[in-house]
Amino acid sequence: MMTMKVGFIGLGIMGKPMSKNLIKAGYSLVVSDRNPDVIAELLAAGAETATTAKAIAEQCDVIITMLPNSPHVKEVALGENGIIEGAKPGLVVIDMSSIAPLASREISEALKLKGVEMLDAPVSGGEPKAIDGTLSVMVGGDKATFDRYYDLMKAMAGSVVHTGEIGAGNVTKLANQVIVALNIAAMSEALTLATKAGVNPDLVYQAIRGGLAGSTVLDAKAPMVMDRNFKPGFRIDLHIKDLANALDTSHGVGAQLPLTAAVMEMMQALRADGLGTADHSAIACYYEKLAKVEITR
């Protein structure tokens, strides 16, 4: 399967290291992005380049997209000079963006008319796991197609799990993003309490991380907050997008997400304060502002 030609569209914080891991695994890659510096970097790593999604579709067996939101994926897949214009029957699109489940289904249906199969395969783990090739991938779509391209996805991931039909991958990602957002908020709330009460938050973190309150989120984000390092592994702006998709989906299926709605308001307040491009660990800043403290070691 490594003789297949792979297209990769979207070389941002996540897409760039993911594409590099595919090259390291021996895949032949054709890339596209709006940033010429990133394109130059990938060319130096051994990739080829194409100027449009259509051009990539004309020469590739499978295309991976890693883009910010539903409209971007729709434009690349179905728009002018998009994948659909260059696609031949048998092409497979693996969309690893985090988008609305309904959008995944709509794009898939449109591509199917051209004989193109689609998997929705969003990822979790942020930039560090994208670099290490240890992302968690949650995949919706045809199981036989999933099986055929499992090794390709595994070259970028620690785990790759099929969760159901098209759209199921993004429903799973929304569940993931709800848990992550609420965990960061809970951590921020707890460390604000400790700081305001005059207890060293780093010692609190060290004391609780091995118990039931310990989590991947706590270990990843508490040190960032205490070091005042809000360089984005995952931006607040993007998490707002995910929570908006979660709330929209919940309204459509009749589920209630009161805690998600509360954290969404916190994130929107942070964006209004100019922190939209900060890492989502900056949720702590919302609590710090209210309590008039700073969580530091």
What are the roles of these predicted feature ranges?
Residues A53-T65, N69-E117:
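Rossmann-fold NAD(P) dinucleotide-binding segment
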Residues D132-G140, V161, E165-A197, Q206-A220, ...:
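Active-site-proximal catalytic alpha-helix in oxidoreductases
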Residues I166, N170, G214-S281, Y286-Y287:
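Interdomain hinge/lid region at the active-site interface
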Residues L11, I99-Q177:
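Rossmann-fold dinucleotide-binding core
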Residues D202-R209, A261-E265:
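Beta-strand segments within the central parallel beta-sheet cores of soluble alpha/beta enzyme folds
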Residues M1-M66, L91, M96, I295:
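NAD(P)+-binding Rossmann beta1-loop-alpha1 motif at the extreme N-terminus of oxidoreductases
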Residues L29, T49, E117-L119, V160, ...:
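Hydrophobic beta-strand scaffold residues
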